[in-house]
C-alpha cells in the first residue's frame, strides 16, 4: 500500500489517498476513516480487497476525505478506478461547497486534485510500473 496526503488550501480540505490496497490494509484505512470522523467504517470498508475497486468517504464537517484505490488487474483498470474515485472526491467537495456541477469551479478543483495525485498515480498508469509498484507494496507490507 502506498499512502499520500495533500491539502486543497483554497478551501481548507484534507485528502488522504491509499493506493494498491488489499484486504490486509483494512485496519489502516479504518483508523484513517475514524480520524476524519467516520462512524461506520465496517460498511465503508466492505469492498476493500476486491480487485479493481475503490471507495471514497468524505466528512464534510471536518472537510476531509479518504480515497482508497485497490489493487488492479491492469493499468487501464487502474485508470478507471482512479478516475472513478477522483470523480467521487470532487463531487463530494463540490456538493458541500454548493458549486455548479457543470461550472468552471468544479473543474478547477478536479484539475488541482489530478495534479496532486499524479505524482503517485503515474506509476500505476504504465503496466510495467504498475506491476513493480504492486510488488513493492507487497514487499513493504510483509517485511517492514
Give the positions of each predicted feature.
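Active-site scaffold of zinc-dependent metalloenzymes
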Residues: 33-76, 92
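Post-HExxH zinc-binding segment in Zn-dependent metallohydrolases
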Residues: 100-130
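Non-catalytic terminal regions of proteins
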Residues: 1-48
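Beta-strand-rich cores of mature extracytoplasmic or soluble domains
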Residues: 5-6, 26, 50-53, 73, ...
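Long terminal regulatory regions of eukaryotic proteins
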Residues: 133-134
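Active-site recognition of the HExxH zinc-binding catalytic motif
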Residues: 80-92
